[in-house]
Amino acid sequence: MNRRGFLRSAAGAGLALGAGLPSLGAGLAGLGAGPNLSRVEARHYVKLPDREIECRLCPRLCRLGDKERGYCGVRENIGGTYYTLVYGKVCSLNIDPIEKKPFFHVLPGTSALSLATAGCNVNCKFCQNWEISQARPEQVEAFDLAPETAAARAAASGCPSIAYTYTEPTVYFEYMYDTAVRARRRGVRSIVVTGGHINPEPLAELLGVVDAVKVDLKGFSEEFYTEYVRGSLKPVLETIRAVARSKVWLEIVVLVIPTLNDRMDLIRDMSRWIRDEAGKEVPVHFTRFQPMYLVKNLPPTPVSTLEAARRIALEEGLRYVYVGNVPGHESENTYCPGCGKVIIARVGYAIEAVRLKKGKCESCGTPIPGIWA
């Protein structure tokens, strides 16, 4: 069953598209419901003869005729001009702990104004937000939130950052970019949670206006990406390299799924690659899988598997390796690589202690990389 079919069957079974989503709660209070679709000209595409276009935003390079949409479902060719249909059309808006993203080396203990529009340029069979990521914009309730309004709302709410999250922010590139520009003017940082399927040119443009990027490295084989992500590993690795070489902070998350991507030889290869291509100080999070969407036949990841993955990554020289989605686990903490003491103590999303002084371990003075202020 494809993603559209799954949505249709869910609707037929009486499941609301909003069920199970991150709560809209008070985040959307005061925002007016607008027309479901925007019509703002997209960036990163070329016009072709006969009113065709080719999208250059992500590696799919969708070539589209008049009135056709890209794979993401949120960008449409109308008369030979390509438009984003979700500019300022927010379907999820919350204030989250930054640790939920997860970012562990960015402003610990603070909150991020977290937003999303509909759409995604891959189709992960284990997606936790499939109701909005795999929907077209007409299928979700959206509210108008202009870039300047989003930036002002973050500042007024005491959020030092805006997170582009929940779905795939690449597909609302224009909105994310413009919001990040306005947020920076107000002293609000921008953090991106992405699967990494973006072409080099738009990525370079984005890296000029955001502060941190978390890449979901969903596996370490093309076979896994083809079967379970409907994407490709190669562009994700290229994205990680590019972010690591920029001035933007990088963290990596690996969702470890039993029997699908939990081979320890691949974990070792992945850890070596991260060490060599992104650097030993890039934080890596091995997180626990929960049955979701189209992969409900597998159990949650054993904690012992996550611990083994972390142990291998440390053996290969990575300095900051975490176990995620296991609240209370000791490997949620940040340990100083110099003296071994806990420098950031966490329980779930809560921060119990931060033992840093000007970005250095209070005990031994070892510099700890990250965005601390």
Model feature map: region roles:
Residues 1-14:
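N-terminal secretory signal peptides and thylakoid transit peptides that target proteins
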Residues 19-35:
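Bacterial Sec-dependent signal peptides at the C-terminal "C-region" and cleavage site
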Residues 31-54, 60-116, 131, 342-344:
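N-terminal [4Fe-4S]-dependent radical SAM core
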Residues 55, 124, 336-339, 361-364:
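Short cysteine-rich clusters marking metal-coordination/redox-active sites
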Residues 65-68, 135-136, 346-349, 371-373:
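Short Cys/His-rich "knuckle" micro-motifs
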Residues 82-170, 176:
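Extended interfacial segments that mediate partner engagement and assembly in macromolecular machines
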Residues 144-304:
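Conserved AdoMet/S-adenosylmethionine-binding subsite of the radical SAM
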Residues 349-356:
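Short linker/helix segments within small regulatory modules
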